[in-house]
Amino acid sequence: WGESFGLSKDFATAQRLVAGLRRIGFDYIFDTTFAADMTIMEEGSEFLERLPEIKESGLPMFTSCCPGWVKFIKSQFPDMAGRLSSAKSPQQMFGAVTKSYYAEKLGVDPEKIFCVSIMPCIAKKDECTWDGGKDVDAVLTTREVERMFKAFFIKPEELGEDEFDDPLGSGTGAGVIFGATGGVMEAALR
């Protein structure tokens, strides 16, 4: 996130981003690592459930965590769409947890929660409209966050560091590598 401000990766920490988001006015700020763990646990369970069918047909089960990939399969290879996992992406998984478990934990009506994700890919915006779901209400790209920082006259080099809110505990290393190439498979194998 700090590249557009000319910040080194050592200085542009997630904690500095959190501090900037709090200054903008976000009430709670979470890391989606835990949600990536939940997604991979769901996909792993589904894989084990489907394993007899997979062995018989020789066809794989595909991850469903990338909306661009899901849309590609459904539009270009509709005969393979049944091979997609039914698990929600980490973004959507966390939105659902926010509006159920976390709302209850805070004693807040889920309807009063407006859940915003910050994602590097614009396909995540489209994902929020699928199946009538409103687990995530809005998605900001990292470029849009940069513009927000500038609109609020936030200078990252002047920010301290702040911690993420911790709704369910820490995520694992598997959740951290989820977004890297091959990360979903490595997380599943862990």
Regions found by a protein language model. Give the residues of each.
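Iron-sulfur-associated redox domains of electron-transfer enzymes in respiratory
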Residues: W1-R190
